[in-house]
Amino acid sequence: MPVDVAPGVIKKLMFFTAAMVICPLLTFFSIKQFTTNTIVSGGLAALAANLVLIGYIVVAFMEDTTDVKAESKKD
């Protein structure tokens, strides 16, 4: 059973998946260069992961759903 998924949705998902992996790792090791305290590095990496997640939620809520609304009115 094929499902029609818009290419834009897949691109957003792939972008935020990569960002969820890359941003915290980059933050952790970048901050670790400036300080030896791994708790600070880990905390900021967790903050980076949360910011990516919040960004994904905001983008998901702002996504255009006019096609879905038009089809539900037809039925």
Curated annotation (Swiss-Prot):
Residues 1-8, 63-75 are cytoplasmic. This is Vacuolar ATPase assembly integral membrane protein VMA21. HAMAP family: VMA21. One of its GO terms (cellular component) is endoplasmic reticulum-Golgi intermediate compartment membrane. It comes from Vanderwaltozyma polyspora (strain ATCC 22028 / DSM 70294 / BCRC 21397 / CBS 2163 / NBRC 10782 / NRRL Y-8283 / UCD 57-17). It is a multi-pass membrane protein. It is found in: Endoplasmic reticulum membrane; Endoplasmic reticulum-Golgi intermediate compartment membrane; Cytoplasmic vesicle, COPII-coated vesicle membrane. Residues 30-41 are lumenal. It comes from the Eukaryota. Belongs to the VMA21 family. The lineage of its organism: Eukaryota, Fungi, Dikarya, Ascomycota, Saccharomycotina.
